[in-house]
Regions:
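N-terminal lobe of the biotin/lipoate ligase/transferase fold
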Residues: 1-85, 103, 108-113
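Short conserved micro-motifs on helix faces and helix-strand junctions that flank
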Residues: 34-36, 91, 120
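Glycine- and Gly-Pro-enriched alpha-helical subdomains that act as flexible
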Residues: 89-91, 96-97, 106
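Short, acidic (Asp/Glu-rich) active-site segment that either coordinates a divalent metal cofactor
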Residues: 113-121
Length: 121
C-alpha cells in the first residue's frame, strides 16, 4: 500500500483522478486541509485545518461502486458502535452521531473506455 500526504491540496479525490495513471493499486492520499473538498452532487465539503480526517483511497479492482459505498458506511458505523457511540447511516452515504453529520463517503469511478479504478473518499 502506498501513502501520500499533503499539508494542503484542492481535493484528495481530485488528486487521484488527475494522477491515477501514475498511482499504484491500494494508494491512500491524505490531506490536512482541502481548499475544494466536495461531496456527492458537487456539494462543497468544508473542514478546518487538522480538524477532520481527509483522505481518499484508490483501487484498481472492478467492483460495484454502490456496494463499496454501502460497505464503507457500514464498516464505519460498526466500529463506532463497538466504541459505544450511537452512529447511524443516512442513506446513501452519510454517517451521523446525535443527529449531526460527521462523515460522508464519496465513491467515484474512473473510466477510459473501461474501468480504470475506483476512488473512495
Amino acid at each position: 500500500m502506498k501513502y501520500i500526504e499533503f499539508e494542503e491540496i484542492d481535493s484528495t479525490n481530485t488528486y487521484i483522478h488527475d494522477h491515477y495513471q501514475e498511482l499504484d493499486d491500494d494508494t491512500i492520499v491524505r490531506a490536512h486541509y482541502q481548499t475544494h473538498g466536495r461531496g456527492r452532487s458537487n456539494h462543497i465539503w468544508e473542514a478546518d485545518k487538522n480538524e477532520q480526517l481527509l483522505f481518499s483511497y484508490y483501487m484498481k479492482q472492478n467492483v460495484d461502486p454502490l456496494k463499496v459505498s454501502a460497505i464503507m458506511a457500514y464498516a464505519i458505523v460498526t466500529v463506532l458502535r463497538m466504541k459505544q457511540i450511537n452512529a447511524f447511516i443516512k442513506w446513501p452515504n452519510d454517517i451521523y452521531i446525535n443527529n449531526q453529520k460527521i462523515a460522508g463517503i464519496l465513491v467515484e469511478t474512473i473510466y477510459e473506455s473501461t474501468l480504470q479504478g475506483i476512488i473512495i473518499g
